[in-house]
UniProtKB/Swiss-Prot annotation:
It comes from Patella granatina. Monoubiquitination of Lys-117 gives a specific tag for epigenetic transcriptional activation and is also prerequisite for histone H3 'Lys-4' and 'Lys-79' methylation. The keyword RNA-binding does not apply. Glycans are attached at S109. InterPro entries: Histone-fold, Histone_H2A/H2B/H3, Histone_H2B, HISTONE_H2B_site. The nucleosome is a histone octamer containing two molecules each of H2A, H2B, H3 and H4 assembled in one H3-H4 heterotetramer and two H2A-H2B heterodimers. The octamer wraps approximately 147 bp of DNA. Residues 1-31 are annotated as: Disordered. There is a cross-link at K117 (Glycyl lysine isopeptide (Lys-Gly) (interchain with G-Cter in ubiquitin)). This is Histone H2B, gonadal. Residues 9-31 have a biased composition (Basic residues).
Length: 122
C-alpha cells in the first residue's frame, strides 16, 4: 500500500511546479507604514532609546487614525463652506478642532513651519 500524502504536501508540490514551469515569482505587495519616520523622530528626541515592533505597530495605527480624523474633519469643513478643495486652512482648522489646547498650538506651529519650508524649497 503506498504512503498517504497529506493535502499540504500536495499543495506545496503543485506550487513548486507552477513556479518552475512559468518562472513567474509573485511579488509581495509592499506594506506602507510610517515606521521609518516615527523612528527618525524617536532618534531626534531620545537618541539612545529603541522601540519594539509591537510599539511601532501601535504608533503606526495611531498616526493613521489621527490622519483619517484630520482628513475627515477637513473634508467636512470644506463641504460646510461649499469648497471643493481642502487647503492648509481647512487642515489647520481641523487640527484646532480635534486636538486639545496646547497640543493644537504646537501642531499648528509645526505645520506652518513645514508648509513654509516646503514652499521656500520650490
Amino acid at each position: 500500500m503506498p504512503p498517504k500524502v497529506s493535502s499540504k504536501g500536495a499543495k506545496k508540490a503543485g506550487k513548486a511546479k507552477a513556479a518552475r514551469s512559468g518562472d513567474k515569482k509573485r511579488k509581495r505587495r509592499r506594506k506602507e507604514s510610517y515606521s521609518i519616520y516615527i523612528y527618525k523622530v524617536l532618534k531626534q528626541v531620545h537618541p539612545d532609546t529603541g522601540v519594539s515592533s509591537k510599539a511601532m505597530s501601535i504608533m503606526n495605527s495611531f498616526v493613521n487614525d489621527i490622519f483619517e480624523r484630520i482628513a475627515a474633519e477637513a473634508s467636512r469643513l470644506a463641504h460646510y463652506n461649499k469648497r471643493s478643495t481642502i487647503t492648509s486652512r481647512e487642515i489647520q482648522t481641523a487640527v484646532r478642532l480635534l486636538l486639545p489646547g496646547e497640543l493644537a498650538k504646537h501642531a499648528v506651529s509645526e505645520g506652518t513651519k513645514a508648509v513654509t519650508k516646503y514652499t521656500s524649497s520650490k
